[in-house]
């Protein structure tokens, strides 16, 4: 119907006769109008299938919108949409036969004209069918080859190359960990300061006048019942959630504050690389290997020569115990291994503070220990960290201070021993519910 309508449009609008009198142009416009909606829907489905966490992980690495689309979203969406696009191409090939109603020189129409002249109906239609099969088969083989090339699931992980081993061996040995970490004192400068932070989701307040100063080298664990605002608080610290009131200072410089459009100001983009973020759901980029995930942000921001960034990536993977898995894709790794790669990826930008949002909640119990060991090693190295966790024993073991939250408010802040022996009724009730985890503490 659309084809006939466009071909006959010059009868109603004579000004279009020069353009639309051509069967090819009329057929082309009709096919484009008909198929563009289907193809656009296929692309939309591919884009919608990319997990939102991929976007947040890229934002936490200070990747701008264009970079996120080009390097993260579109490559994944294309992999998802490719099979449906191949099917749509076959549909388009079949629909070209409909265009013959307006006398376009389409293969089937040419065949019909031939057998009216030579009277070899079977032979002519057989030749026409061979052409159709050839067109579809060749394209199908090309698409299959492209799918195979894009499919990370069928790739086998390779070992480290001689060049990579040489770069790794040229790196200076890692400094020995402190046998017992030195806790931050009042003399340490404040790295991150939260002043009067408020946040609402609709009419529901989730953060109420939060004030917190995090010193350099300090480890702070945020605990509290589910729904107390812990994750919302840590997400405001690196700009994943906008502020409704208050401000955040990073190294005594403006970092985040409320804006009319809800978007961070230039202060944020100038300093965002100083904050590393590790998510509960890992959010590794599935089309990149473990090493490529770690190298992605430094390469994007041009922090050094490619060989230097490669050496740094290998060193970080060695640090988290995954050097032998450098060329594996995320789906080839266990949950604990993926989370350790995520930690290495966050460390690749050499942040001054690390944020951990329930880093072990999505892991099987037997995988938790390896991730916690990496975090503990970072604490012993003096890394400033804020950890939202339900691992009570771990939180009380490595933290300088414990922050207890409930209903969007900070109810208690103090040293682990002080929190453990607090008389606050709500805190006592919460700790009592965590009694089994806390019995292993030796404070």
PLM feature segments, named:
Residues 255-276, 419-423:
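ABC ATPase NBD coupling module
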Residues 238:
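Helix-to-loop junction immediately C-terminal to a conserved catalytic motif
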Residues 395-397:
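A short, surface-exposed alpha-helical micro-motif characterized by mixed small hydrophobic
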Residues 1-164:
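Transmembrane alpha-helices and adjacent helix-loop boundaries
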Residues 354-357:
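Catalytic Walker B motif of ABC-type/P-loop ATPase nucleotide-binding domains
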Residues 328-331, 349, 381:
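Conserved signature/switch motifs of ABC ATPase nucleotide-binding domains
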